[in-house]
Amino acid sequence: MASVTSVPKTGRSVNQDVPATTLTLQTRPTPAPNFDEGEHLIRVHATALCAGELYWHTYVTFTKEETVPGPDVAGTVVLAPPSSPFKPGDDVYCRIPYSRAGGARDHTIALTSELARKPKNLTWEEAATVPLSALTAWQALFDQSGLWEGPEDERVKGKRVAVTAASGAVGMWILQFARIAGFDAVIGTCGDGNEDFVKSMGATDAVNYKTTSLTAWAAEKQGRKADLVIDCFGGKSLADAWGCVKDGGVLISMVGYPEQEKPAGLEVKDVKSHFFIMEPRGDQLQKVTELVEQGKCSFLMDSVYPLEQFQEATDKVESRRVRGKVVLKVL
């Protein structure tokens, strides 16, 4: 284990002045891990920002004194509990819950249950784009859909899945996982110019929502409706998703509550619908690592900024005019 004396007493940290959304770069004490709680001290190499995270304090009770953005972290273990499978010097990545300080600082804290080994074929910045998006996609498809509870040979055989905002950071991961899982058809909605990208990620059909709604597309030909529809955008997109789900199908959203967006007068039978929030799962992220290292999945990175340019990076994320993740290079 690395010596405690090798850990600097202070470090750079981008802190949010809650309840405001103001961010400042400060010099703060290096966090001390509690080994009894499975905490590891991580030297952060890169962190990815998330749109809307500066407003999460209105929904989440923070368990730490500091509010630091950057839920996606890629870094090196500095200190670890004696029983941890992750040792000092290990290259790891993870998703940190919004209730704790994130990765926009020199050192941060991560739990054993959150960590996975960083893919060897990704740079630090590339690895930081993966955890939040990939885990959200994984849990939507494999945990929340209910399709994996039956006999193995019947789970996806002949099944169709539709994904809204399929060219986005989460949607593109769902497409890849659905392709690997063997769905009979994978439908993805996207805007102008993204059709080829969506198909390259695994979609059998790309629907340009600016010219054709998902509801209209599904109604054009018999058999186009999906057994599973996953919404990654909310609002009108979620309302439109109702028109594409089969009777007896499943509609999931990670953005809003499907029943609140259900169009008035729409007749659907026995559709199971729900909203979910992903949970940090190192065991699932490790499976993603294996897929990435095998060349079966790819990432999507928009841009990289040094930590000192945190405000420019944040402004870009909040503009929503990005394609992929915006990353802060910390080390």
Curated annotation (Swiss-Prot):
PROSITE patterns to which the protein is assigned, alphabetical: CBM20 (PS51166)
Keyword terms: Mitochondrion, Oxidoreductase, Transit peptide
Region described as Disordered: spans on this chain: 1-34
EC number, as in UniProt: 1.-.-.-
Principal location class: mitochondrion
Leading EC class: oxidoreductase
Molecular-function GO terms, alphabetical: oxidoreductase activity
Compartments, as annotated in UniProt: Mitochondrion
Residue stretches of biased makeup (Polar residues): 1-29
Superkingdom of this protein's organism: Eukaryota
One GO CC term, this protein: mitochondrion
CDD domains, sorted: MDR_like_2
Family the entry assigns: Belongs to the zinc-containing alcohol dehydrogenase family. Quinone oxidoreductase subfamily.
Name of the protein this chain belongs to: Probable zinc-binding oxidoreductase, mitochondrial
Organism: Arthroderma benhamiae (strain ATCC MYA-4681 / CBS 112371) (Trichophyton mentagrophytes)
